[in-house]
Amino acid sequence: MLTERQQRLYDSFYESTHDNEYLDQKTEVLVGLSAAIAMSCDPCVRYYLVQAKKEKIPKGAISEVIAKVMAVSAGQKRLQVDEVIDQHGICLDSYDE
């Protein structure tokens, strides 16, 4: 658990992320949604989906965000496995013999 002071500081930081200088409201919601999905934060995903509806963000934009998170995640996993294969000198072609 956070101390009261830590919680106040966190709350202040979190609130500051909604006071954007460069991102418009719709972009902020889509960035938040993508981060929430990537971090597997179910309450956060729900929050940003509710915000997306309030901002009238179309289903297509939400679908594109979900697809982008999926693509980055899949790419990261592929690179992770490639790195293990390279580090340990594993030849997958030999598995067909």
What spans do the regions from the language model cover?
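Hydrophobic alpha-helical segments
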Residues: 1-97
